């Protein structure tokens, strides 16, 4: 039934503004107090929608549920008597009574009114309640009880509570002394008006319009209300009994209240909610039925945890297709700000999901430009994400709860990536799909098993993941997800495992071959190890891997290969580290050999031209009898042929004349045995003191060859 009485102290000082009077046992109550330093200006009521729209409302249309926290008891010393009724309006009062209208909150309101002597009831007096109870008994609907916990409305003439908060005007002149004033209802040809506090309601065929800033005061109408109730009660009951009988019996003991144009106007300090409330204006709210629900258990919980009793409404709203179209006009900046909170709300629903990380572009609403494709949470449909986003935006969530939710989210992500440690085949992305790859899928190569007897072991290391949303040209706009760094734990090396090597110096390479990226030539299977971690002699390894080591030049000191190319297979990185060490060892060996060669040249100066020309020459015959058993020149490795000129050194080694002449011009030694050949110009004393044996031995040899 429509409730025409509310309790509100007209005069409240600064101290009493933070409290309100005791909650009625079964009815709605007027709330005057502070919420985050703001004030609740007034509480108004609206009638419900028509029977046709009520049936649509039961079909599952949008509802807005307003859950009010408990409020503290009011300091009754500062309360004043009831405001007077506006004298300009007619003194007649219309009390509409249908089959669905029963005194649901009458006893509770009367009880709370009697406990507060400073506030007088206007509508729910004993006479009016007796009249309404008698009207209800005539329609055999006395089985409906006043439920203190839940009071839902779904009838033609019932009303809903509107809690209007002045949260955006800190300097607002709506002082805390604004009280609810019950004014007369004017009956003008089927039109009934009533003024409640700062709001005037025009009741015409079950519709309500609210006009603010009207504060009339007229004498009390308790007597007129009783007379008007008796007068119009029977007529209205007869008019509405036939149409509403079915709905009354279906509702049972639970009352549902809704309004044709009822919408909860709620202002918050959040800029996002301000934009949403601006679009959901009264013009667009004609098709949105309201649903008011009071939960005493919820209020009891908040009453025990809140030191200062405030009103914290929580609106749970099911977003319809029309409202989704209205929200498409929001700018991108607001959508980006809400993206993180939307994802966290979606994670709570999809926390236990383990579906494959594929989400289709067709299912994604292009109006929102932020989307997260974490594999275990990627199956969130756009409508579900929108529903959770609306819950997160409109709900008055405490900061402690928000921090706990953030911690739970990041912990879930960390546990997921730590547990997801097995190899998976990379999935192909078809048209209209995005592939949210895992850290292993961003590797340049797949983890193939080696062809050797011993299988590869995955080495621990750091993987820096850069998941990016890839889509075709027809897909909507997307943003790259922020980099997430996943660190692996370093474990001790076991037998047969390759050590993880990193280099701390700049690479210098003379390779001028191809400039392909590292992930294109990464072939871990081409790298073989035997049982002792030794490289097998496979000459095709270096040929197959067309490595351009200049790609790794310029890295900062202390930056290893693993950090530089985090998306490459760790096995390939290990191979590159070993290859680098081998290259360094080879360069060291070559440098040592070059130093040795220089020392030899210094110790053995080149032979003189006269000494070279004085060497004996031998003509090679067909049977090679002149040169003995030698078949080829040791310098050029060419076989001796007939009529070639061979030269014999003092050590009895034969060479081609041109070959040995070039050699002796660089070093005065035999290319085969390194025996000293007499130098070109040398001091006799130095020669006699330093190398007497070397000079004597060739002489003896020549003496022996002469006979």
Curated annotation (Swiss-Prot):
Keyword vocabulary terms for this entry: Acetylation, Cell membrane, Cytoplasm, Cytoskeleton, Endoplasmic reticulum, Golgi apparatus, Membrane, Metal-binding, Phosphoprotein, Synapse, Transferase, Ubl conjugation pathway, Zinc, Zinc-finger
Q: Does the keyword Transferase apply?
A: yes
UniProt cross-references to CDD domains, sorted A to Z: RING-H2_PJA1_2
Q: Which residues carry this modification: Phosphoserine?
A: 306, 320, 339, 430
The organism of origin for this protein: Rattus norvegicus (Rat)
Subcellular localization: Cytoplasm; Cell membrane; Endoplasmic reticulum membrane; Golgi apparatus membrane
The enzyme class is transferase
Q: Name one GO biological process term.
A: long-term memory
Where is region (Disordered) located? 1-23, 75-120, 242-290, 380-403, 424-493, 686-707
Assembly and binders: Binds ubiquitin-conjugating enzymes (E2s). In vitro, interacts with the ubiquitin-conjugating enzyme, UBE2D2. The phosphorylated form interacts with PRKAR1A, PRKAR2A and PRKAR2B. Binds the catalytic subunits of cAMP-dependent protein kinase. Interacts with MFHAS1. Interacts with TBC1D31; the interaction is direct and recruits PJA2 to centrosomes.
Q: Which PROSITE patterns match?
A: ZF_RING_2
Question: What GO cellular component entries does it have?
Answer: centriolar satellite; centrosome; cytoplasm; endoplasmic reticulum membrane; glutamatergic synapse; Golgi membrane; plasma membrane; postsynaptic density
The molecule here is called E3 ubiquitin-protein ligase Praja-2
In terms of superkingdom, the source organism counts as: Eukaryota
Residues recorded with modification N-acetylserine: 2
MF GO annotations: protein kinase A catalytic subunit binding; protein kinase A regulatory subunit binding; ubiquitin protein ligase activity; ubiquitin-protein transferase activity; zinc ion binding
Q: Please list the residue ranges that the record marks as compositionally biased, kind Polar residues.
A: 109-119, 482-491
